[in-house]
């Protein structure tokens, strides 16, 4: 897309004072007005730093060694004030809590307008407009710190968009949203583009950008390796895999099938593109060989391709009995309604549902941080609220959705070590445990850094390390993969699986990552408006699309594709989907 250049980087290299190694290296980039540019990168590749440069946060707020030029509508950004930046740019950061300042949602959203002296009548009009635009009509009087992570993210989006910036910079804006909520935000962003605004969106998952962005940039270790259209981007499969970027499931499946000899009519990257091509294939109008009369997926194939789930021991680790929780005034929301659940020792469970469905409230009740209005939680045969805080920490570990609430030591190493010393574990055992957990989570090289110098993704991994190092009976993680690229997300879930397998820990994750829930979890519990809607193995849960729609959750892409094609039971991953087609057609 050609036209007026909104932002430009010329030979930009940048390093922070705490690290001599440049985070960005000789970056050259032109962004045109009205363009939707997607920046794809793994955790720690410099994407948030790049966005901060484009927004003027660097060098006006964060200092460092900056070489080269950053131009906003042709003006060197070093010479511009932050106030002038604010007229043209609006930035949504990865952590919504870092952008919330006011008590009430309505005050938060109009705060920027108040600072600019916008008339009260105009503020009221714009407030109503953006509240409706971001599906926040009932949130005006809500308290910001009582919102779920996804709700906070939408409020921050609204507070930035209300000022009508010509350039919108988004750092993983859907990371804490349920799948349908994320899709709604993307559609809202596309509406923004109709007014000729520029959107620059950082993402570590290509799927979120395909079909929406008109240009994609691959950033790796501070350098731009690819800058092209979406179709050309995904065809660079070898390069993407080399730098650890996971291809979209639909594209991965289609590539495998073509390699096996299937004559797909197209190489789709999204579900919408895939359906026509795969319907032709299944109807016998394309493809190779003769369709077999066997079932879509044999028991043998299912066992060979399914995720290897160790399962539980049968001993009860956590029991939730007739649990009700009502938040006190002014919120006064009945967040949990007669919830009954049992978690066996060694179980790996996922709690899913739309933002505000009660997932985090349930997790905090299980951990003993919230006292139920009625009913209770039994951990190790005892009421969790009757256990003293030291024993509770040994029995139930909890990792918050915002990792910064759990980080307070001077270095990454000391942060993890403190947890062990607090429980009386010292000496060589403590040192070995710290090194093992940091190496496994790819944090050992950062052990000397202050936790607040880490990226959001690395902070999340550090918070998990601090709790997992204790090896509690039950480990609850609220959105363990927030801010993680797919490779690191997979590594975190693998670590949790390893902890479960080695020590019999019951693992409970709250997640919007359906692919991870499908591949790692023994059980999936879907909440809807504070009630348990579904509670079954992943394949059974994800096959019930109508009920899942009530929770604003969508199954993994290949599962959706199979269900649309009438394939039952549906596959949970690309390996299973590939096996289905190889069973249905003889080559």
Regions found by a protein language model. Name each.
Residues 221-222, 530:
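Conserved ABC ATPase "signature" C-loop
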Residues 240-316, 548-587:
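ABC ATPase nucleotide-binding domains
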Residues 160-161, 468-469:
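ABC ATPase C-loop
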Residues 55, 367:
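Helix-to-loop junction immediately C-terminal to a conserved catalytic motif
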Residues 143-147, 151, 450-454, 458:
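Conserved ABC ATPase signature
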Residues 63-75, 375-383, 392:
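Conserved ABC transporter NBD signature motif
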Residues 168-171, 475-478:
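Catalytic Walker B motif of ABC-type/P-loop ATPase nucleotide-binding domains
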